[in-house]
Amino acid sequence: MLFLLSIACGPSVDAPSSSAIKVGDDGAEIDTSAAGISAFVASKAYKTWAAEANVHTATKTRPHGHVRVFFNQTSTVALKQNQSSLPVGTMVVKELYQNDGATLSGYAAMVKSSEKGWTWWEAFLPNLDKPAAYGIDLPGCKGCHSGPGNVDQVLSQVP
């Protein structure tokens, strides 16, 4: 399954240079380099964000299997206001689970890093410092996230 996820999102393409973007509900910044996103996810700082109530099966068109999605305040406000273009600083973190829906296997994150696009990141335990996918507007990530029902690449409903 991990191989399929790597193929779905694709390898690193057009990796962005390190830059800091405000994503924290308290104005905290995140370094959008692969190492910066890895460190942010490993810190579990996203756990204070709005989140789906439970782990659930992703739809058949999504490669992530079982997921639980967390939304930063920027994304929560924009999605609740039905904005069609989300602001820079929007961040969504997905916890990825094995088929049993209980065993955490990795994470995927997306950060609106510019008005024109998203920085995508995906890594699997125990190697969060070695992402399977990382870059700006990765074709595999964009391919799925551009599907029906998306709001500026976000497919999940804010809780």
Walk through the language-model features, giving the residues of each:
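C-terminal motif of bacterial Sec signal peptides marking the signal peptidase cleavage site
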Residues: 5-8
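Small cysteine-rich, disulfide-bonded extracellular modules of the LU/uPAR three-finger superfamily
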Residues: 70-72, 79
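Sequence context surrounding c-type heme c attachment/ligation sites in exported
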Residues: 10-30, 36-65, 77-159
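Sec-dependent signal peptide recognition
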Residues: 1-2
